[in-house]
Amino acid sequence: RFAGRVQIKAGFEPRPNIQHVVFDFDGTLSLVREGWPEVMVPMFEELLPEAEGDTSESVRQMLLDDIMTLNGKQTIYQMIRFAERVADRGGTPEDPLEYKHEYLRRLEKRINSRVAGLQRGEVSPNQYLLHGSLDLLNALKSRGMQLYLASGTDEVYVKREAKLLGVAEYFGKHIHGALDNYKNFSKRQVIDRILKKNQVSGEQLLIFGDGYVEIEDCKNVGGLAVAVASDEANNGSGEFDEWKRNRLLGVGADIVIPDYRDAELLLNVIEGK
């Protein structure tokens, strides 16, 4: 029996042949960037031209919806969307890449002490790993599965933080993140490459993610999608983030979990054991 919460889609069918497992990073394994919307939304509020009928609540809601709908894609897409909002309101938007760099500068300030604490060994990586992450990674490795990391966060940061959290070794050279030349990377490209290179079908693919993009990409190729509706601010609470849960079920997630406290059991269910 599951000790924690789990939601399994009606009509779920086990996949005994899974060989390749793709993880999103932030919110799925890493909590180093927890709270990033509290950096992005205020920045957008500050830079957005006013329009008639605006209330601070309506603007915030609009921006949050834009941001969360694109969660899982490279950060640049949230900036492109914001630039469109600025233009719609008669403003002259900056280049989205400028917005991205300014956002990353602000976010770096917010997470600076977390990164420094990890670098100096003052903080246990467990504090910034979603509850049960290592149990899950070890359980997958012991089954001989090939693991990949594909993140919408810039690749340099993904590599830095995966290393600091002690999870880089599970993925080896298969750590992929956003590039300034954003057309050269997407989660879908990573998935397509895995299937093509290994000559396998989506039947053999398992994806863990907390953004709608990777769940949708996974279902589009016939993979099994585990949505991680993690409550990032309360790691280990075992509670769902309801917004994520509803959103990810809406794009076809097969299983929804809040964290990995039931890692071994979860994999047995997935494999039909």
Predicted regions and their residues:
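Active-site neighborhood of HAD-like aspartate-dependent phosphohydrolases
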Residues: 4-61
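Substrate-recognition element of Asp-dependent hydrolases with the DxDx(T/V) motif
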Residues: 40, 122-128, 133-163, 175-182
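A metal-dependent, Asp-based hydrolase signature
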Residues: 65-126, 131-142
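A short, structured active-site edge motif that brings together acidic residues
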Residues: 97-98, 168-184
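Surface-exposed amphipathic alpha-helices with a cationic face
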Residues: 134-142, 195-196, 215-226
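Glycine-rich phosphate-binding loop signature in dinucleotide/nucleotide-binding domains
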Residues: 142-145, 198-203, 270
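Acidic, Mg2+-coordinating phosphoryl-transfer loop and its flanking beta/alpha structural elements
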Residues: 151, 207-258
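Conserved Lys-Pro-Asp/Glu-containing loop-to-beta segment of HAD-superfamily phosphomonoesterases
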Residues: 185-218
